[in-house]
Amino acid sequence: MPQRGHPTQTGRAAPGSGWAGPGEGADTIRGMILSDGSIRRLLEDGRLIIDPIEDVQIQPASVDVRLGPEFLVFRNHVTEVIDPYDKPADLNERVQVAEGTAFILHPGEFVLGTTVESIGLPDDLVARVEGKSSLGRLGLLIHATAGFVDPGWPRGQITLELSNVATLPIKLWPGMRIGQLSFHTLDAPAERPYGHVDLNSKYVGQSGPMASQYARNPK
């Protein structure tokens, strides 16, 4: 195992004093979770975009994100079944929560929400969407499967997949800290980052909660 501060077999420095941080030259360590200091440096350099953000949101190895006031709910009374390849236009209904009021998420219910913050990632960085421990202990899950934000993600909000697995309703307050993002470096910049012309990137620049676009996939 390489010692701290000594070159590895790839020619990059191992973690230790003098580490430049992501995207800063030959000493960059790839494949690591970013610390608070590295997150701040990327924000200052403009390579990582989180807007708006306050310094208190930056945790030791993540950034807290807040819940926006918009939700997408399923219109169960008009839809009998969901076909991912043939999504009806009236499957979802948009709900805007007034300032000072909460959205009530009932047991077993699933809705789409959004972050307050818009996120932008460089081509050599991915983000993971994670819940908050204190909310998880209340039975709130913030994503079903979509916990991965691709490298090159253009500036846009993150859609949250909110579900209540508890036995009591949960109040969701706009502006509350709903989750956190951790950031991971790639071993090399992505050759075809999100939004590349050769990819079927369906959520470029999303604003507010965005319903499933699975029907746009080829069968």
Identify the function of each model-found stretch.
Residues G16:
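Acidic/negatively charged segments and metal-coordination signatures
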Residues Q3:
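Detector for the Zn2+-coordinating histidines of canonical Cys2His2
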Residues D27-K219:
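DUTPase catalytic domain/fold
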